[in-house]
Amino acid sequence: MCIRDRHGVGGWLAFAAVLLLGRRDGRYRDGRLVAMAPSSIPFLALGSWVLIIGWFGFNVMSAQTLGSISGLVAVNTLMAMVGGTLAALIVGRNDPGFLHNGPLAGLVAICAGSDLMHPVGALVTGAIAGALFVWAFTATQVKWKIDDVLGVWPLHGLCGVWGGIASVSYTHLTLPTKRIV
């Protein structure tokens, strides 16, 4: 129920910006990735959780105009966040950066279809987004040698596009509705 396609557009614009800006000095040495630790894991966790709480509120509150659908939006938002967290935890092998970006990947992906999907579809959407983020962030840094410091392209660009596809794919898994006679 978020602004439906803004994540994908923003992510792809960020990808273009990262390509134009180039790599940070010292990021690659002899063609190999040089590890640069995050400046503060506690601040990474705090920022992620502030975003999650705010995102949850934004998603649900933006559905208030849809009448009785806001409960479904709340459940779907939570399910996508759980799916993204679990997938990033498993695929990312307990890496704190992946663990804290996994729920955000799920949230980005569910924005397009939070009012359309069944909660199981939201869980699957979030899980695929979490795994997609881990794979794409790693490939971007290691294989393609593109220095996207925050992972904006994998998080918003790819997970946003995946969310748009999933919102169409999983719409048939809808909840039964009351018939108006």
Feature-to-residue mapping (PLM):
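Transmembrane alpha-helical segments of multi-pass membrane transport proteins and ion-pumping complexes
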Residues: 11-19, 23, 48, 52-56, ...
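Structural signature of hydrophobic alpha-helical transmembrane segments
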Residues: 69-80, 121-127
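Cytoplasmic-side transmembrane-helix entry/capping segments in multi-pass membrane proteins
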Residues: 96-104, 151
